[in-house]
Amino acid sequence: MHTRMQIRNRVNFGKITDLNLLPNLIYVQKKSFDWFLQSEVKDPTKRLNQGLEAVFRESFPIESPNNDMVMEYGHYVLGEPKRDPQECKDTDSSFAVPLKAVIRLIIKDTGEIREQVVYMGDLPVMTDHGTFIINGAERVVVSQLHRSPGIFFSYDQVRDTFSARVIPYRGSWLEFEMDNKGILVAKIDRKKKFPATLLVKAMGMGTNEEVLRLFYGSSKMKIAGANPKDLKRLIGRRTIADIINMETGEVMLDAGSKINEDNISILREMKVKEVDVIEFPKGKDNPVLINCLEKDGVNDYEDAVKKFHTIMRPGEPSTIENAEAELKRLFFSPKTFDLGIVGRYKINSKFEFNNPKEFSKADDRVLRKQDIIETVRYLVMLMSEAENYYPDDIDHLGNRRIRSVGELIANQLKLGFSRVERVIKERMTVQEPEQQTPQLLISIKPITAVINEFFGSSQLSQFMDQTNPLAELTHKRRLNALGPGGLSRDRAGFEVRDVHYSHYGRMCPIETPEGPNIGLILSMSSFARVNDYGFIETPYRLVKNGKVQKQVEYLTADKEEYHYMAQSNSTVDEKGEFTSKLISTRHRGDFPFRSPAEIQYMDLAPLQVVSVSTALIPFLEHDDANRALMGSNMQRQAVPLLTEEAPFVGTGMEARAAYDAGVCIVAKKDGVVSKVDATGVWIKEDQSKEIVHYPLIKFKKTNQGTCFNQKPNVSMLHTTTGGKVSKVSKERVEVTTPNGEKETHELLLSDEVQFHAVVKEGQEVGIGAPVAGQIIKGEKYGDFGQILQKGTVLANGPSTDAGYLALGRNVLVAFMPWEGYNFEDAILISERIIKDDVFSSIHIEEFEIQARETKLGQEQITRDIPNLSDKAFRDLDESGVIRVGAEVKPGDILVGMVTPKGETDLTPEYKLLHSIFGEKAKEVRDSSLRMPNGFEGTVIDIKRYSRETGDELAAGVEEMVKVYVARKRKLLVGDKMAGRHGNKGVVARVMAQEDMPYMEDGSPVDIVLNPLGVPSRMNLGQIFETQLGFAAKKLGINFETPVFDGASEGDVNDFCKKAGLPENSKFQLYDGRTGEKFINQVFCGYIYMLKLAHLVDDKIHARSTGPYSLVTQQPLGGKAQFGGQRLGEMEVWALEAYGASHTLQELLTIKSDDMLGRARIYEAIVKGIHSIKPGIPESFNVLVQELRGLALDIIIKDSEGLEVDISDYEDEFSKNKKKIKFETIENV
C-alpha cells in the first residue's frame, strides 16, 4: 500500500457545527473581480452596467468642444493572457489580458461613422486563487472597510447638539448642525454656513408658512366664543401662518410667532374666529426652525435661490438661471454628484422611501429635494426627542461597507478615463475632422499609469503573505480600514478600533494586529459574506412560531437590529422546538431572555463569530482573548516543515482551510487514478474516459522565501510478486502468484479512501504492476461558492497533511522548570528534534543578474574572469553559470560576468594584442554575481533568459540569469517557537536526548516548557490540548474539538481513561542525567508546536569591515547594510561611569568616524607600532558645517588661541594632539 495512506480515525466533539454550510473562503475576492470583469457573459451587449462596463459607459460618449463630432463606446473585448501564472512568475512579468474596446467616431456634418477596435492597455487579471501577479510577484488586493455613503445623524455629547451629514460616493458633502445661537445651519463642503431653511426654500418651499407646514403638524384653536380656560391654553402657542388684517393688509402676527394676551385681544378685536397653531412633537416648544426663518431673510423661492448663489459664489452675478444651475451642479447633476447605488439604498431604507409612484426609481443616484427635506425633518424630530428617532452609530456595521477588489479597480480606472477624456477633447480641437480616427484620438497612457500605480504602489495592493497556506488565505479575507478614502492611523480613536456588537458573525473580534494598526486591520468571520451593496452578511436559521426551520437567511447588521437572535447552543428537540421556556438571546447590544415565540432567528454555528485563523485554535473558550489574538497571528507565521503532520487535537476547520487556500491540487471531475509519480497525477475521468494530467509544483520559492512543494496524496495498489488475477470484486482483488500463493488487495479502506480495480480476472500481471486505482471525486460548487461536493485532494501543498492543514508538529511536552533554561518563556528541546528533522524547514533564495548593454560595450556572462584562482571556478560551467547541486557559501561566484572598463588611447603594442586575441585583451572589470553574506545552501535551479533565444526582457537587458539556492534549516538556539494559544518562546538550549527528563517507560520528553507561563497568561487551552493530545497518541486517533462547541473537561477525562492515562495527566518523571525521580509528578502530554518565521539565522549578525556613511563616515546600521552595532549615549555613560577614557576615545574616533585615525591604525598594525594618536572625528566636521549652515561663522582655535584649519590638522601625521575650542563671531 502507498506510504501516504496512513488513515487515522477522527473523533469530532461538535454537536452543532456544520462546515458544509461554509461559503468558499476566498469567494469575496473572486466574486468581486467577476462582478468587475463580467467575463462569463458571452454576449457583450448583455453586460450589466457595473464594474468595467460602467466605467466605459460613464466616460462615453465624448463630444468635441465645438460639437462637430462625437465619440461613442460599443463594447469591450478581453484577449487571452500571453503566459500562464507560473511563467509570469519565472519571467518577472504580469499576468494580464489585453483590453480592447469597439469605439465609434461620428462626424456630425456628414453623418460618417468611423469604427475601430482600440487597444486600451493590459489589464491584470485574477488567478484561480484570488491573487494577481504583477512583475513576477504574487499580490493581493485587500478589501477596504469605509464609511458607507448615505445620510447620518450624530449626537455631540460635549455641545449637547445633533447634526446630520449627507455623504455621497462622489461629490459635495452637505452638513446640518446647530450653531451657538440655536440656529440650524447648513454647510456645503465645510465652507460658509447659512440657515438650513434657506436651502429648504430654494427647494421650492418659498414662504415661511410652507416651510412650517412641511415640518410640523397644525391644529385649529377657536377664539370667537371660547371660554377663558381655552384662551389661556392659547397663550405661548405659535401660529403656523401669517395672521393678516383683512382691511388694512397688515401682518398682525408672523408665522411662528408666540401668542400672548395682547395678541389675543387684538385678534378678538379683528373678529378672528380661529387660529392655526403649530403642533410640536411631544408638545414641547422647539423654536429651532423659527429662529432659522427669522435669520434667512427671504420669503419666496427666487430670493432664496439667489441668496444661496450669493453665499456659494460671492462676487458672481446672481441671476435666477445662474443660481438654479449652481444648485443643480452641487446636488442634482449625475456628473458632479453621485450617491452610488449604496447611498440611494441607505437613504431609501432610512426614510422608508419605498413607494415607486411618489419617487423616481430606486437607483436614482443624485440627491432629491425630498431627501433634503426629510433630513431636516429627522433632525427636528431628534431635537424634539420624538419616539423612534435615534442618532446613528457611525461604528455600526450598517454604516460601514466593504470596497472589494473589483470596485477599487473600477474607481482607479474612472480616474484614468477622466484624464483620457481631457486628452481626446484637446486632440479633437487640434486636428482636422477628416484625418481623425478613434485610434489617433485615444491615448492609453493615463489608463496604464493608473493601473500600474494601483497594483504597484497602492496601500491596498499588498505583497502576498505566503509564509504558509493559512497566511495566504487570511490575507485574502483581510479587511483594511486604512488606505485612500479610509481612516488614518494617527486620527483613528478608540471607538472605531473597538469591538462592536454589530461585528458578531461578520468581523472577527479576536484576529487583529498588535501595535498601531490594532482594530483597523480586521479579518472576516468564517461564515460571513459580502452582499451586492458591500455590506457584510452573516447566516441565521429562521425561527417561525418558536420552531427552528432548516431555512438559512443571511442578514446585514442593520436588518439584524430589529430581531431577537437565539444562540446556536440553545437546546432544540427533534421537531425544532426550544426545550426551555426562556431563551438567552441577543438584541442590539443586550442579552435579554425571551420566550420562543418572540425569537425570529437563531445562530447557525458557534464558529460564525470568529475568523478562520481563530477557528483553528482548539479549546479557544478556555483562552484569554489577548493570548488568542497572539495565537491567531502566530499561526500565520509558522514555517512549512520538511515533514508535515496534522495536529492530534484540531478543530475540524483544518481540512477546509487547506482546501480553500488553494495550495493543494483538487480533482475537477470524478474518475480513477491511472498513474502517480513525483511530478504529477493522472486521472481517468468517468464521463469523458480521457486521462487528465495534474502536474505538481516542485520546490518553488514563495514570496517569503519558504518552500512551495506538492506531494501526491492519492495512490495505486501494486502487486509485489506478479502472477494471475484470480478474483476481482468491489471489495478486493486477488492475485495468484506463480508458486500458488494468494496476494489480496483490499479496495474499501475507509469511507474516504476506496479503490477501483484496473485489471480483469485471468489477466497476467508482472511484478510491481498496478491492480487498482484510487476512486476520485470531483469538486462541485453552489451559487454562493458553498461546496456541494468536496473534490478529492490529489496532492498536498506546503503545510498540509492528507488534505489537512499541518502548520507544526505534535511533540511530547513536560511542563516543569529545568535549571532556569526555560525561565521567562524560554524553551528547552531534545536533540532528537534536530536529529530527526522534526522542525527542519527548507528555505529558498533567488539571486538574479542581468547583462546589460553599456556605453562602453556589452556586459558578458562568462567563465573568463580576470585575477581569480581556479578554485573560484570549480563549480561554474563553460558559460560561467554555477551547476545545479553545487554547495555555495558567502562570496562564492554564482554567475561570472565582466563589464567593459573605460579605455584611454591604446598603444600600438596593445592594438596588436587586441587584433590577435580579440576581446580578451580589452580592459574588463569583474561584476560577477556572488553569494551574499549570511547565505549558504545548495543550488537547486537555474533559469536563463536571453534576447537571442527570443525571450522578452526589459529595455537594455541582453541576458538574465536566476539562481535558486535552497537551504535546510534545523531548529537552533534562538529560534522562535509557539503553540496555538499565544504561548510563544525562544529555544534556549538543545539537550542531549539521554539527558532529557524521561517517563517511566523510558521515553524522553521532546520539549520542556515553564509551567509559570500558564496561570498569569490565562491560556488554559494548551493544558486541555496537551492532555487530549496524549490520549490521541495512545489511541491512534485524531480529535476535532470545534470552538465553543468542543470537548468538555469530562470528555477529555473519559478519553484519558480509555487510553489508560491518569485523569490529571501527571506522570512520574526521572532526571535523564542522574536517573533520579523528580520530587513531584509532572504534567505531560502531546502539544502542537509551530516553528515561526523569526529564525535566528536571519537576525544574528556581526560586522568585520564594511561600508561607511558618506556624510558622517560612521559605519552603517542594520544587517542588510552589513552595519555595525550602535554605541549610543547610554553606552557612553556606562563607559564614563567606569572611567574607561581610552576605550571610550578609541570607540568614538578610530573605531567610528576618524578617517585619518583609521588609516593610521591600519599602518600601525602593519608596522607593529603601538602608540595611536586619535584625530578629529568626521562628525565634528559635520557639526561645524551644520553650524555654518545656520549662518554662524565657526573659527577653530588651539590651546594657544591660534586659528586651526582642520584640513591642515589632518595632514600633520606625527604632531602632538592639540586642544581645540570653537568660538562664534559673537563671542570673539
From Swiss-Prot:
Gene Ontology, cellular component aspect: DNA-directed RNA polymerase complex
Catalytic activity from the UniProt record: RNA(n) + a ribonucleoside 5'-triphosphate = RNA(n+1) + diphosphate
Signal peptide: none
EC number: 2.7.7.6
Recorded superkingdom: Bacteria
GO BP, sorted A to Z: DNA-templated transcription
Tagged with keyword Transferase: yes
Keyword annotations: DNA-directed RNA polymerase, Nucleotidyltransferase, Transcription, Transferase
Keyword Transferase in annotation: yes
Transmembrane domains' residue ranges: none
InterPro entries the record matches: DNA-dir_RNA_pol_bsu_external_1, DNA-dir_RNA_pol_su2, DNA-dir_RNAP_su2_dom, DNA-dir_RNAP_su2_hyb_sf, RNA_pol_bsu_bac, RNA_pol_bsu_CS, RNA_pol_bsu_protrusion, RNA_pol_Rpb2_2
GO molecular function, one term: DNA binding
Subunit structure: The RNAP catalytic core consists of 2 alpha, 1 beta, 1 beta' and 1 omega subunit. When a sigma factor is associated with the core the holoenzyme is formed, which can initiate transcription.
NCBIfam families per UniProt: rpoB (TIGR02013)
Role: DNA-dependent RNA polymerase catalyzes the transcription of DNA into RNA using the four ribonucleoside triphosphates as substrates.
Family named by the database record: Belongs to the RNA polymerase beta chain family.
Protein name: DNA-directed RNA polymerase subunit beta
Provenance organism: Leptospira biflexa serovar Patoc (strain Patoc 1 / ATCC 23582 / Paris)
Lineage summary: Bacteria, Pseudomonadati, Spirochaetota, Spirochaetia, Leptospirales
